[in-house]
Amino acid sequence: MTSAVGTSGTAITSRVHSLNRPNMVSVGTIVWLSSELMFFAGLFAMYFTARAQSGGKWPPPPTELNLYQAVPVTLVLIASSFTCQMGVFAAERGDVFGLRRWYVITFLMGLFFVLGQGYEYYHLMGHGTTIPGSAYGSVFYLATGFHDLHVTGGLVAFIFLLARTAMSKFTPAQATASIVVSYYWHFVDIVWIALFTVIYFIR
């Protein structure tokens, strides 16, 4: 009996430790995120090109960016990286309840960000900043819009992951999936920090 318990404990420990080893899913995700980084680099290049060719005030009237609204939304998204990582730590310990708790919090923070961005779009469009209205409108909505789509994709990933952990026994494969989702979430957070800095502070 003691031998059986010892064998079981060794197997669980081995599976947990295996999460720290590189695997094809994690490596593939990193390679894919590298290609996504190049995509966003193209959007940054487009933004700076439009800015260089504007020859006037940037952003041009009637655009009025609301920094006081953007800062709290940004801080919430940054904080969501920490809650996401806490979920990863829970997954590595085999703590499915901790994983769910932290990932639900992360999901809600990401949703808050998306809704905040939607409100900013509503405000800007109401003041005449549109895609066909100016070069600034085009590059602003393209850059931030594609980022919002990526954040939304992350929210969908959280939903699927949480559903999987609720419908079946927690497995090392699910723990690996949670780690992969965290890679993606950290990526969209880092991209937003760069976008936020460029759009709101580099005039």
UniProtKB/Swiss-Prot annotation:
Q: Name where it mostly resides.
A: membrane
Q: Does the keyword Cytoplasm apply?
A: no
Where is this protein localized, as stated in its record?
A: Cell membrane
Q: Can you name one GO molecular function term for this protein? A: cytochrome-c oxidase activity
List the catalysed reactions: 4 Fe(II)-[cytochrome c] + O2 + 8 H(+)(in) = 4 Fe(III)-[cytochrome c] + 2 H2O + 4 H(+)(out)
Enzyme Commission number, as recorded: 7.1.1.9
Per the UniProt entry, what are the Gene Ontology biological process annotations, in alphabetical order?
aerobic electron transport chain
- UniProt xrefs under PANTHER family: CYTOCHROME BO(3) UBIQUINOL OXIDASE SUBUNIT 3, CYTOCHROME C OXIDASE SUBUNIT III
Write the protein's name. Probable cytochrome c oxidase subunit 3
- To which species is this protein native? Mycolicibacterium paratuberculosis (strain ATCC BAA-968 / K-10) (Mycobacterium paratuberculosis)
